[in-house]
Amino acid sequence: MKAELIAVGTEILTGQIVNTNAQFLSEKMAELGIDVYFQTAVGDNEERLLSVITTASQRSDLVILCGGLGPTKDDLTKQTLAKYLRKDLVYDEQACQKLDDFFAKRKPSSRTPNNERQAQVIEGSIPLPNKTGLAVGGFITVDGISYVVLPGPPSELKSMVNEELVPLLSKQYSTLYSKVLRFFGVGESQLVTVLSDFIENQTDPTIAPYAKTGEVTLRLSTKTENQALADKKLGQLEAQLLSRKTLEGQPLADVFYGYGEDNSLARETFELLVKYDKTITAAESLTAGLFQSTLASFPGASQVFNGGFVAYSMEEKAKMLGLPLEELKSHGVVSAYTAEGMAEQARLLTGADIGVSLTGVAGPDMLEEQPAGTVFIGLATQNKVESIKVLISGQSRLDVRYIATLHAFNMVRKTLLKLENLL
């Protein structure tokens, strides 16, 4: 199946906004086994939009239009598609009720006739409810070509796609099942090298590597009759892949940390803290609270995290954490001594089960004769205080801080698994 994405909005063409919807939709279509062959952007102009729809209908099986569903006169997507399909626009009862409920809570005068446009759908289409906005989407098939209209705001589009469109397309078209494996501690080029025979000779299942900042994912996909068969095929391939070793001789299983497109090292670590009923604190220097803010972003974070420290200067490290200033000056802030002292003092001061620390050189300049990207991460438990040195080279200051935070989460994750004898 060939799909085409059409982004509608003059603001995209003028560079006022970035078309992040195209990337999101392309990923979702890939998960469903639907190939996106074309991406088009067109302004808020009926004639040009008609031309784009006509072209898409001649070369694609699935045409997805994003944007132009709002209440203003330049929101023309549904109206133009209806004109092309020679269909009427009708009102969706559920969308009308949502409009009524929305404006019932506001001044009656704030509701104008053009608001009603958001509740319209193309006659004969399947409405796609909008959980986070007012403009209803839709799905319709005419003469063997399927058309989808989606709202432009990314928060509305993502919700509609995940909750409405993906289940609908899954029933109609797809028998593709996927599993995403996540790795930290190995680069994409090395991963592709050690798995080159699998990747070069792949048929079904397929293997698709993706590089992200600081980590790599592998998407394993298979077309089969049901989930049980897919699980068997993907599970067998996964076992074969994880049995391979990196160029340094480390099993890939050691750098594999979890599953899922939307998963993360931070989430895995947070869930382990909750599972094993452990509390954590952090003392941060170069990351300036990034570890703590990431951890606090998860609902229920207060179960495992009560607070921590951000101490940038040597003097603040001494004052906030009670570390001897002369010893700090002797060893330097970019050192194992400082990292271990920060982690242990943070743990003792808060009473947490685990203390973690990050200190180092974010860059771009050297510090204490250490190059940019040099990071020491400390970790303290009741039984042990340790640290690791990480060199994050060739990265921006922002990425050094982000990747350092990933290393800290990974260190905590591995410690938790060791405590439970799972690693």
UniProtKB/Swiss-Prot annotation:
Residue stretches in coiled coil: none
Superkingdom, taxonomy of origin: Bacteria
InterPro entries linked: CinA (IPR050101), CinA-like_C (IPR036653), CinA_C (IPR008136), CinA_KH (IPR041424), Competence-induced_CinA (IPR008135), MoaB/Mog-like_dom_sf (IPR036425), MoaB/Mog_dom (IPR001453)
Family classification: Belongs to the CinA family.
PANTHER family named among the record's database cross-references: NICOTINAMIDE-NUCLEOTIDE AMIDOHYDROLASE PNCC, NMN AMIDOHYDROLASE-LIKE PROTEIN YFAY
Name this protein carries in UniProt: Putative competence-damage inducible protein
Record gene name: cinA
